[in-house]
Amino acid sequence: MIPARLFDSAPDDARTVPAREAARYDTPLPHTLTAHLPLPGKDPVWPYINIGKWKIDSNNYAASWRHELSIWRHEHKLRMGYSDAQYRRADTAWSQRNFVHTQMMVEDRYFYDPVARKYTVDRYLDDLIHRYGGIDSVLIWYVYPNIGIDARNQTELAYDMPGGLEGLKQAVLDFQRRGVRVFLPTMAWDNGTHNEHKPDWQAVTELAVAVGADGVNGDTYNGVPRAFLECADGHGIPLVYQPEGSLSSDEMLQWNLQSWSKASTEVIPAVHKVKWLESRHMVNLENRWARDRTNDFQYMFFNGIGYTSWENVWGIWNQFTERDGETLRRIATIYRKFPELLVSPHWEPYSTCLQHDVFASKFPSPFCTLWTVVNRNEYEVEGETLMVPHNAGRRYYDAWNGRELQPLLAGDGAAATATITLKLEKRGFGAVLAVESAAPVADLDGFMASMAALADKPLQSFSGAWKPIPQQLVPIAPTKPAATAPVGMVTIPAGSFDFKVGGVEVEGYTWAGMDFQYPWESTARRYHRHRIEMKAFHFDRYPVTNADFKKFIDATGYHPADDHNFLRDWVNGAPRDGWDNKPVTWVSLEDARAYAQWAGKRLPHEWEWQYAAQGQDGRIYPWGDQWN
């Protein structure tokens, strides 16, 4: 690794590359800016103002832009009374290397095996390593969309994880054993559930202490309030805070060591404001519904920030394409080799690039310097690409392809330059490493060999095609036919039925793969309409009651292997007094199937339920078309 004390002096190559006289960036800057800094140059005049930002000459304005934005940064920090104390803490410094983060649904079958009834963290992590190089942290998600189905609040849902808190604690330890940090969620919007009469910061901190978590993700927060940090400090536990949104107040940067954010979409990649203000702050880009993540990865690589590799989105599977997975693997490999460079306070975006729509950022130290390069063109670029100041004895490496470079050197002394030739795939990436004379870089040869092995297969040779995951309904064995309705059942007559339903998922789009797939459909979709010729069937007149379920248990001795919360409303193995005819609750799907099999019945399909309730006249509610 590179020595830790990198930045005690000014960067040795903070010089202007010889060129034509640079333009002055004189756009007035307000005290506050949005998530991205303004681009380095003047916006083109009408009619190109909205469609022609690619015309901005970033090379010509870059030096002046960096100068003006450095002044703005200095003054802005003075105005807010900025303190970097939290970034100097050794016990939370890992956040500065938390490059690949994911949100994981606890229902994910790679995380938990319901048959074996055990957490399978190794299986989950091994799959991610195989597909895109693995993760540095995970957000264990046990709340939405299930919250609200009963009175349990966000903390109580964690207590009800398989194995309870001890089971969750072991899962956390299993992640940490593999070098993966663990975040827990907190929801400001959880207001209609059981009130524990304690503030959210106290509830989630106590939970983090109990299971040994490393951080807290603030769902829907644009900055986790300072009360969370003060509560954690009071409990003597170091927690990293990570709001879902970009910080609404720059002052919150002082204790929110991480944040999620979105990428800019301009051809010229924008600089992320928070990263510019505090280079040690880890931004993890999030774009959960993306099917092509190239723009995300280029913005990420240019800014030296991280990514949220979220695929299981509320139970809807949005898997990385092969190309996206391989791209993230290569970026993360470079990041994990040179984490100290990516937090350099002397970061310089918009290094001089000689190819149109190719952009680079410089992350320097006294020992070595990394340039991250992105090709925004939809075609391959090859030739002289990057012009940088040169120091005598410096060696250059193509860190993306794993080979040493022989740049074209010109000038001497302070005017010396190196012109570097690169070959960049269309919409591709590059990385240049400059190592000063006799500078120590541990196992550089091994790293270069690893990158060469990865680069042996170009990114464009991996499939970029996104495909929805197919869904198949598990067949249910038919029950024994009955000519007339058994006791307690009614006959639903045969008929033609327009089955119409629309998904309630609040996010996402109307793509293939979104929501649910019925047996007659070729792919999952949000909206469904299908005419079904229904056969007659018998249907229970009333929901299964507590008394009915008690008869089943008495007759069979049924008891589930996992009995947590099983028949939670019962007392001493029986329904409460007066509850015999109430619908039975706190039974699982497996419990319901076991009861139905004992009763000689089966659970209804969704379209059978809807047909029984809606009838043949298409009414919206069982009683008619108007809400009563």
Each language-model region and where it sits:
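Aromatic- and carboxylate-enriched substrate-binding clefts and catalytic-loop regions
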Residues: 148-297, 301, 314-323
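N-terminal accessory beta-strand-rich subdomains and adjacent acidic, glycine-rich linkers
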Residues: 2-84
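Solvent-exposed beta-hairpin/edge-strand motifs
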Residues: 388-404
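Active-site-proximal substrate-binding groove within the catalytic cores of carbohydrate-active enzymes
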Residues: 57-58, 64-66, 236-385, 390
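An acidic-aromatic substrate-binding cleft motif
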Residues: 52-118, 141-145, 480-493
